[in-house]
Amino acid sequence: MSGLHILAFGAHADDVEIGMAGTIAKYTKQGYEVGICDLTEADLSSNGTIELRKEEAKVAARIMGVKTRLNLAMPDRGLYMKEEYIREIVKVIRTYKPKLVFAPYYEDRHPDHANCAKLVEEAIFSAGIRKYMPELSPHRVESFYNYMINGFHKPNFCIDISEYLSIKVEALEAYESQFSTGSDGVKTPLTEGYVETVIAREKMFGKEVGVLYAEGFMSKKPVLLHADLLGGCK
């Protein structure tokens, strides 16, 4: 296959939506191919079931315009630095050949989110080594960025999602089992105004960069701008 433009990894289905659903919708609307890879089935989540979460993930993907979504069924709360996990992620990277890869930001209250970022970073490096898993052709990712799930960290750069906030909210609301208690659910940090908190964060980031809403991202490397700083104005 020719490869994805963007491949976003998350520890659980809904992680990617929380961090960058607006950005994904923005790029799929422009015709770019975007994929999502969830590492676990979130089987330890307080609400919902594995089967329901997978159905919700399919709905959210469709809302964002994502045609490729995978789940590696790694153990929830067991995302440790293991060679077998790195190899599985390398297979995904080499199969789908993304230009850009995203994963959660390392500083997050949930250990699975931080460990997901570390595993993906290791896999990106290994995916470019020719003699590592030689049965698959090597692939070098052009850039690796981190999106935010929990917290209000100061981003290295932002992407304007003002026109796509409604899609982000719709994608999040697809996870009804996670963001509302329902008749048989229990209260968690996700059910107590979490979506509203995410919206407030994107509004804050937007205010800092002069737009209505924006998603913030982190990068360990300097970011090269591909647009005129003056927007073509003279």
From Swiss-Prot:
NCBIfam families: thiol_BshB1. One of its GO terms (molecular function) is deacetylase activity. This is N-acetyl-alpha-D-glucosaminyl L-malate deacetylase 1. It catalyses: (S)-malyl N-acetyl-alpha-D-glucosaminide + H2O = (S)-malyl alpha-D-glucosaminide + acetate. Keywords: Hydrolase, Metal-binding, Zinc. It comes from Bacillus cereus (strain ATCC 14579 / DSM 31 / CCUG 7414 / JCM 2152 / NBRC 15305 / NCIMB 9373 / NCTC 2599 / NRRL B-3711). PANTHER family: N-ACETYL-ALPHA-D-GLUCOSAMINYL L-MALATE DEACETYLASE 1, N-ACETYLGLUCOSAMINYL-PHOSPHATIDYLINOSITOL DE-N-ACETYLASE-RELATED. Its EC number is 3.5.1.-. GO terms for biological process: bacillithiol biosynthetic process. The lineage of its organism: Bacteria, Bacillati, Bacillota, Bacilli, Bacillales. Gene3D superfamilies: LmbE-like (3.40.50.10320). Involved in bacillithiol (BSH) biosynthesis. Catalyzes the second step of the pathway, the deacetylation of N-acetylglucosaminylmalate (GlcNAc-Mal) to glucosamine malate (GlcN-Mal). The keyword Zinc applies.
